Every structure is written in C-alpha cells, then in structure tokens.
Amino acid sequence: MKRILYIIIGMVACLSAKAQTVDSLTICQLLSESRQQPSTACLPLFFAQKFIGRPYVAHTLEGNATERLVVNTRQLDCTTLVETVTALTLCAQNRKYAYADYKRALTGLRYRGGKIDGYPSRIHYFTEWIIDNTRSGVVTEVQSPNPPFTAVQTVKVNYMSQHPQSYQALREHPEYVAEISKIERQVSGAQFRYIPKKLVGNKKLLRGAVRDGDIIAITCNKAGLDIAHLGFAVWKRDGLHLLNASQIHKKVVSEPMTLYRYLKKHPSHTGIRIIRINK
C-alpha cells in the first residue's frame, strides 16, 4: 500500500514538474520573441494575443497547503491573464528576459508589497491590486478627462468575509477571515472615477481616453464586490473591444462584439475603470 502511495506521489510530482517546465519555456519563448518587437509595439497586446485560445480555468491559484507563487500559462482566468501579461510586459520593457525575472515581476503584482506571507498576503480585490501596484510604480489608473470619466465608484467590498464558504482557503482556515475583513475595511470607502456604461459606446470620447493594451476593469453593482471582470482594450474599426479570458467562451478570446454591446448584455455591469501599465 505504501509503495502505491509513493508511486502516486511521484507521478503527481512528475506531472507538476512537467507543467512547470512547460510554463517556464513558454515565458522564456515569449520574452525572447518580444525582443524583436519595434519600439512602437503595444507590448500588452502583443503578449495578450499570444494567449488567445488558451482554456479558461478558474481557481488555478488555489489548493496549495502553503501559499506559493503559481505560474500557469496553460489555463487562465480573467485575473491571471491580466497578471501574466502585465508581468511579461514589465520584463520586456525593462529588458529582463529570464524566467526568474518574470517570477519576481509576477510576485510583485500578485502579493501585497511583493511579499508572500500566507493566503491573506495575496491581493484578492482588484481595487487593492490597482492601489498596491500604483504605489510600486508599475501601473497608473486613468481617471480623466471628464467626460468620459463622469461617474464615481465608491468602493465597498466585503464579499469574501461574508461568503467564506465560497473560498477553499477560508473554509480550511477560518482564522483568515478576520485578516481578509481588515483588508476589506481598508479598501472600502475609496473613490475612483470611471466611464459609465452609457458612454462606452461613444467612440469619439473613448478614443481620447482609452488606448490599445490598457487594462479594462468592469465595475458592477453586485453587493460586496468592486470589479466583475477584467481584460485588455483592443481598438477595432467598429469600436472598442475586450480581449479577455472568457468564462462564456471557455477560453481566451478577443470578443467579436464591441465592449459597449458586451456591457449591455450584463445588467450588473455599470461601466469601466482604466488602468495603464507604466513604461
């Protein structure tokens, strides 16, 4: 029986090692390809488009006994796509092409202050992600001109502490809930200007405010949440589109419909916040 258990453990470790090898090769290949891009290239879109077709899989950061950095380029959700592409962009801009450089960049984006110290140290609300990464100098939230940034979001987050049963780590470690609740209180009350849904269809206004490769954070009116979905801005002939890891399409796609039409199909979506990766 012990022998069988050891074999199973060995197989799992082997599969994990193979996955890590695939991920590291993917990252190094993409960073190598980025060296050939002209200085005028939109690096966030260059990298994001490389992931089109990758399967949408949620919760890929969960399930580890001890919190650690997870690199998974094979399966993405809306948040991990944004983090993966942003980390690649930062590396390419700084001419850092090693896998270790990428892991440092990803750690800095995903964990508060760039330090891994248990599950609560991971940034779980995108508003805090913006605040933390603005503080570290890697992104800037665009909140002007007005119009189109005519609306103000007053953040009120408590979804995780109010629904701990929805999160594996909180079910297994109820002591984390108090820490998460403290973070929620710190983030709540902050105000940010955003573009309301009704103005997202105004191409003339948006052209002056949103650029290719900007991170789009879709605001919502769902109780306890700040952001419903994430993706990257892509301008096409008919208007602004969203490149995202789509739960609906079950893969990474550049949405065929305009972002305005996309938002209209989701009554709880109220508008968009715009975050730009610093150069």
Provide a role label for each language-model segment.
Residues 1-24:
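Bacterial Sec-dependent N-terminal signal peptides
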Residues 10, 188-191, 208:
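Sequence termini and other peripheral, non-core segments
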Residues 20-36:
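Short N-terminal segments immediately surrounding and downstream of signal-peptide cleavage
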Residues 31, 40-55, 61:
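Sequence/structural signature of beta-propeller domains
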Residues 34, 38, 68-75, 221:
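Short, charged/polar micro-motifs that form catalytic or ligand-binding hotspots
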Residues 56-193, 235, 239, 244-247:
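Acidic/His-rich structured neighborhood in mature extracellular/periplasmic domains
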Residues 194-206, 220:
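Short alpha-helix capping/helix-loop boundary micro-motifs
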Residues 211-279:
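C-terminal soluble interaction/assembly domains
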